[in-house]
Amino acid sequence: MDPKATSTSKTDNIDQITIIEEKVNKIGTEPTIRKYSKGRMLGKGGFAKCYEVTNLENKKVLAGKIICKASLTKSRAKQKLISEIKIHKSLRHSNIVEFEHVFEDQENVYILLELCPNQSLHDLIKRRKRLTEIEVQCYTLQLICGLKYLHSRRVIHRDLKLGNLLLNDKMELKICDFGLAAKLEFDGEKRKTVCGTPNYIAPEVIEGKGGHSYEVDTWSLGVIIYTLLVGRPPFETSDVKQTYKRIKACEYSFPDHVSVSDTAKNLVQKMLTLDPSKRPSLDEILQHPFLKNANNIPKFLPASTLACPPSTSYLNQFASPENSVKVPSQPAPKSAEATPLAAQKNGRFINTQGSNMFGSEKTLVTSPHSATTQAHTNENVVLTSQLDRHQTQGEKGWNFTKTGSWQSNLNGTQSVKGSSRPQTVQQKGDLKSAQSLKAPALLNNLGSRLRVSGSAVGSNRGQVLSGNEVWVKKWVDYSSKYGMGYNLSNGTTGVFFNDNTKIVFNQKTDQVTYIQRGKNDRQDTVTHYSLTEYPKDLQKKMTLLQHFKKYLEGSEYGGSESINDGTETQIGVYVKKWVKTKNATLFRLSNKTVQVHFTDRTEIILNSENKQVTYVARKETEPISP
């Protein structure tokens, strides 16, 4: 007998907690109740909403896709849901989101899926704008592995897009959302349903006359590769009809201002061919020069690539000797320009920080539709020149059989262990950041969101940082509503808002600086005001700035830490990007300093100006838990 469920909710003094109760009926035994707590929303689509769901019995955290039965009044919608469940439930592959469980009650259908905390490639492109070719190669190989499995099971996905490609806590790519997928009954069968997402849809689907098959996924894969390399889909326009017109004419080009290799262009051109029969098979794609040398492509990318491109030293590990980029013996840690890591339009990255189960692209349906990745270190060595090499342990190389399948032996990860004393070392390469991107629970009290790098480590930090160094002294995470407020060591107070704007108060000059991203991602727009004179549309943000300032300066944390005056050029330093992960909070300042504050109260500060990496240990008397 299929399990049934009922859902109830209870409210405490802080937040409303919704408990989903599943009544499990087993033959020969009394019914049992399995309980889940419903957490933050991860995304939503036309018929469903996705939430973080925790099994209260085993504490396993899942993604719960909840479909309201009231939206399934039409028989076609019901059949679509049944088909999605049937297809997804039958799939088991490392590059496909795992189907855990399904049950229902009188109001909803609940589909429990593997949680992918590092979000989707759509979210990644919003932050990074575009990826390096080695990253595109890595994700493409994983996607092809998943597609080969699907096609071997006679399944066409039919809605491949960046929003449906998720990253789990190990940075594995996972295909999700089988709402438009089709299961063919026999080889050579064609489907004629017009379905998909406008920017990714294949021309034969739009035409609809001769039907379509597996080749539509190949077309979408070509669009995905182009989008990852360039930063926007090849046929995108402001009008869907115009987009379809360009797709049917295969009208696109590579922009001159973006550097794309000839081999990458050639592969995309072969895949974006109007005649489906002339598109390369998945095995032929694997043999293309862009992907053929799989041993020089990492199997998984470091979590730092969620925020910035791989460093030159990291890339050189996978480059052939003749193509290796020559670098100085001790270069500064690379810090690339990237889109801020705070919330975009929907605030999902910092605000909810869950995987985007549905993406943000509009899907069209018409009829005849880690484990944390961490640096591997010795107990007595915190940062060494070998960090980049550790970055790829268990990640390097693809081993394809004749059918294109691959086997991996991913080495187990180790926790980062710090020495008992602060130390400053020269370091090349980039540091792998922690991965599992989970926001803290929503709290009513602003004070309860305070996180401080203050007095407990402040004295230690002072021993290893120069007098004109600037760092984040303390901060408060209120991104569930507004943003993140912070104090710098030079006395500056700032707020990084969820809409990616920033406001900074200089206590020496009483000047307020407001920073907005320029149109078309060009240079930021910077305007200056005072605390008393500013435009009316900044009233709310100015009020929030003063609230954050008052709270941080009056908090009990870090009060004994002296302010580092800094130099005049450093007074303009502010937090340009930030991200909160499961094991750390990362800040990138406008002077390109990168600060990582781990949950065990240790810190790492990377200074690109003086090519210095500073490690700050916690005090022996300080508890490990924050």
Swiss-Prot record:
Tissue: Embryo.
GN (gene name): CCRP1
Ranges for region Disordered: 399-433
Catalysed conversion reaction: L-seryl-[protein] + ATP = O-phospho-L-seryl-[protein] + ADP + H(+); L-threonyl-[protein] + ATP = O-phospho-L-threonyl-[protein] + ADP + H(+)
Keywords: ATP-binding, Kinase, Nucleotide-binding, Phosphoprotein, Repeat, Serine/threonine-protein kinase, Transferase
Protein's UniProt keywords contain Repeat: yes
EC number: 2.7.11.21
Cellular-component GO terms for this entry: nucleus
SUPFAM superfamilies documented for this protein: Polo-box domain (SSF82615), Protein kinase-like (PK-like) (SSF56112)
Cell membrane recorded as keyword: no
Family (UniProt): Belongs to the protein kinase superfamily. Ser/Thr protein kinase family. CDC5/Polo subfamily.
In-chain residues carrying the UniProt-annotated modification Phosphoserine: 71
UniProt binding sites for ATP: 42-50, 65
Protein name: Probable serine/threonine-protein kinase CCRP1
Function: May play a role in the division of some cell types.
Domain of life, per lineage: Eukaryota
